[in-house]
Amino acid sequence: MTKRVLISVSDKAGIVEFAQELKKLGWEIISTGGTKVALDNAGVDTIAIDDVTGFPEMMDGRVKTLHPNIHGGLLARRDLDSHLEAAKDNKIELIDLVVVNLYPFKETILKPDVTYADAVENIDIGGPSMLRSAAKNHASVTVVVDPADYAVVLDELAANGETSYETRQRLAAKVFRHTAAYDALIAEYFTAQVGESKPEKLTLTYDLKQPMRYGENPQQDADFYQKALPTDYSIASAKQLNGKELSFNNIRDADAAIRIIRDFKDSPTVVALKHMNPCGIGQADDIETAWDYAYESDPVSIFGGIVVLNREVDAATAEKMHGVFLEIIIAPSYTDEALAILINKKKNLRILALPFNAQEASEVEAEYTGVVGGLLVQNQDVVKESPADWQVVTKRQPTETEATALEFAWKAIKYVKSNGIIVTNDHMTLGVGPGQTNRVASVRLAIDQAKDRLNGAVLASDAFFPFADNVEEIAKAGIKAIIQPGGSVRDQEFIEAADKYGLTMVFTGVRHFRH
């Protein structure tokens, strides 16, 4: 009995060669629309789909394969006489191989000028139906959705006259993943169109970007997936120019650093980060000086850390950076001389280019946190804040220099693990106190790190101070200005303590926990 294949593809890469090889093996080819034209033009004989269905393609191609002669040929079980008799009685010929890929919905909606009508028109209906029918009947039918699988199918057909059950099962699993992702992307698009922020069903679509050697620790398996609709300014979109593959921990740290620097868009800025916490942030009129400030913030912790810059790296900055052991450098671009300096002297240094996007993250861009048996979803902590909305709650007003430093500190504290405290001046961090289980311990940690650089320094807290003993520690260190959300039932005690020591204190009204 002659074997039959149905081919209908939007991605025509390799399809002519694949069909030619099938012809050599004696296969009969059914095809549709543009695929048939491409094969016919290449000299590959095909049968038109309407010759099989008895109906013409209609409604601008919306209806062409949704027919019992197609789906009966795909779904008939070869091991059931009743199925085979039904097919024979209804003059349905069996189809043994399906090669289909779908309308380019993703590519369509990524176009900057796409219209809603264009998006809707690129939702494939017949393609997923054929794929699912063939995949369901994988005991008898081979289904191919990815051109990368053409070779293995041809090899098995040439060697054995058929594909193995293991191959058919693997390809069926691939099809169900593919159609599920395709439908999820359509659902995501429509959900966004109607402004639904809390859908009752949540399906996320990601594509495998990089298999990883291991996860956070060597005993943990890991892989890196990228959003099907990529975010421009993200670690997943960065171009690697040098060094080994990024590790699991590299990617997490780099992501954290990129999130931080996105908030420092107005001036040349350098962020140094270690274990998801900033260990140095420097801001200046030029990127070399910003590097100096970031490095001087904590010359010890930066060792083995990640550095991200929001301006092009020049030779002078590269010379300074190459003298420090770093895991990763991320910048919008590098001069040729700077890149040569970094690559020649640091063969394993991971160097990434990521064009800086000064646009702030969208509040509607979700963050996902896995818990056992569930998933927490929240929008990003990108609430727009203005110093004009802040409240000075003490008798003493901040000086102009203190006000600038407080604004700098408030941007930085958002990215310190809670309980988080940070000490800064108006252009660099001086001490970071992250992740302590009581706030006064974080205060002491940040102050101890700042040491003899506290003259003119300010302090920021990611959440309110629960007790007035915190202000005593701060005042004792010589810090004269504090910024915090406020909101404690003991706020008045803290305000009175600040007044007692001659401090100025600002309440922002916004908390920035980070766990």
From Swiss-Prot:
GO terms for biological process: 'de novo' IMP biosynthetic process. The keyword Hydrolase applies. Pfam families: AICARFT_IMPCHas (PF01808), MGS (PF02142). It catalyses: (6R)-10-formyltetrahydrofolate + 5-amino-1-(5-phospho-beta-D-ribosyl)imidazole-4-carboxamide = 5-formamido-1-(5-phospho-D-ribosyl)imidazole-4-carboxamide + (6S)-5,6,7,8-tetrahydrofolate; IMP + H2O = 5-formamido-1-(5-phospho-D-ribosyl)imidazole-4-carboxamide. One of its GO terms (molecular function) is IMP cyclohydrolase activity. Residues 1-145 form the MGS-like domain. Its EC number is 2.1.2.3, 3.5.4.10. Pathway: Purine metabolism; IMP biosynthesis via de novo pathway; 5-formamido-1-(5-phospho-D-ribosyl)imidazole-4-carboxamide from 5-amino-1-(5-phospho-D-ribosyl)imidazole-4-carboxamide (10-formyl THF route): step 1/1; Purine metabolism; IMP biosynthesis via de novo pathway; IMP from 5-formamido-1-(5-phospho-D-ribosyl)imidazole-4-carboxamide: step 1/1. Keywords: Hydrolase, Multifunctional enzyme, Purine biosynthesis, Transferase. Coiled coil: none annotated. It comes from the Bacteria. GO terms for cellular component: cytosol. NCBIfam families: PRK00881.1, purH. Belongs to the PurH family. The IMP cyclohydrolase activity resides in the N-terminal region. This is Bifunctional purine biosynthesis protein PurH. It comes from Streptococcus pneumoniae (strain ATCC 700669 / Spain 23F-1).
